[in-house]
């Protein structure tokens, strides 16, 4: 699989989001998903301390075992873990890092990310503590998530990566965040690349939403509107006319962005992992991209 850069780290073009571990799938199934990812050439595993209150990190650490040196472990801190554990104050993040290291069963974190901005803590204080962790060898690179372009600028180029929501149906980062990443040579990691399942191909115009699916959830009617489903049909036709699938279009469109280092996608089965791992290989041309924009208009 193609490799790209996050600072000094070489990462696979598709990364495995570990948010389902413990919440939607148990440890045995999580291990099967991890094994399938490694077999498919994925080396970036993205988790967070709040994913099932630390169980995601624990499952990942135990599954990797002696394979730890082969892969890039990315985790996050800062979202509310409980009433006392949250935010980006130096004293808290130091403890959060130690807790993540223990749960992951490792002595270093490849990419340590601030999960969201903390308005109560000056970013300079947070960055100072993160730099201490780097100097101590406990963290190799630092990143952020859910940051605006202004907040990225305020960090003064200290972050190696930015992880925000981005897909064909959520293009807000294009206005300011992606250009800022380009200016500062910061890697961008899109999450929710399949727009909450809308770009999987499971949801079709004129067909009922599958029971128990994301489309059947409370926010389904808005996301899975007739307008969006019509766009999905146009995208499917575009992909199939060129011998590809909607899934491949969703991943490859993101991979065509120069600042994108790895597309972070969750999975609950080995089959999903294998499909995601091969989905970013379609080389979209300079003629394809504006045509896709027209389809989404």
Where do the language-model regions lie?
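Beta/alpha (TIM)-barrel catalytic core signal, keyed to glycine-rich beta->alpha loops juxtaposed to Asp/Glu
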Residues: 117-297
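Short, acidic/polar
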Residues: 25-37, 88-104, 148, 152-153
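Alpha-helix N-cap and loop-to-helix initiation/capping positions
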Residues: 25, 29, 55, 59, ...
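N-terminal binding-site loop/beta-alpha segment at the start of enzyme catalytic domains
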Residues: 1-71
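N-terminal small/glycine-rich loop or linker at the start of catalytic domains
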Residues: 6-22, 74-85, 108, 113
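Structural motif
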Residues: 36, 40, 103-104, 137, ...
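Acidic-and-aromatic substrate-binding clefts and catalytic sites of carbohydrate-active enzymes
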Residues: 22-26, 48-57, 81, 118-122, ...
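Active-site groove signature of glycoside hydrolases
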Residues: 101-120
């Amino acid at each position: 699989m193609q490799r790209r850069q996050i600072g000094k780290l070489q990462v696979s073009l598709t990364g495995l989001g570990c948010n389902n571990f413990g919440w939607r799938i148990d440890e045995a199934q999580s291990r099967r998903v991890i094994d399938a990812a490694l077999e498919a050439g994925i080396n970036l595993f993205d988790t967070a301390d709040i994913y099932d209150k630390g169980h995601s990190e624990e499952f990942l650490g135990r599954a990797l075992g002696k394979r730890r040196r082969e892969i890039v472990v990315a985790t996050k801190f800062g979202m509310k873990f409980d009433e006392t554990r949250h935010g980006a104050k130096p004293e808290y993040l130091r403890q959060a890092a130690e807790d993540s290291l223990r749960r992951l069963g490792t002595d270093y974190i490849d990419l340590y990310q601030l999960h969201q901005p903390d308005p109560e803590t000056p970013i300079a204080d947070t960055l100072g503590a993160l730099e201490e962790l780097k100097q101590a060898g406990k963290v190799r690179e630092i990143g952020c998530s859910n940051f605006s372009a202004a907040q990225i600028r305020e960090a003064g180029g200290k972050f190696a990566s930015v992880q925000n929501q981005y897909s064909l149906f959520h293009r807000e980062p294009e206005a300011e965040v992606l250009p800022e990443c380009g200016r500062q040579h910061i890697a961008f990691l899109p999450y929710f690349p399949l727009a909450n399942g809308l770009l999987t191909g499971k949801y079709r115009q004129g067909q009922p939403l599958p029971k128990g699916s994301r489309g059947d959830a409370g926010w389904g009617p808005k996301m899975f509107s007739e307008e969006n489903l019509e766009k999905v049909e146009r995208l499917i036709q575009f992909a199939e006319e060129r011998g590809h699938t909607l899934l491949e279009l969703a991943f490859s469109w993101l991979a065509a962005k120069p600042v994108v280092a790895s597309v972070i996608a969750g999975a609950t089965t080995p089959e999903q992992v294998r499909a995601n791992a091969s989905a970013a290989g379609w080389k979209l041309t300079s003629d394809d991209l504006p045509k896709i924009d027209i389809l989404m208009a």
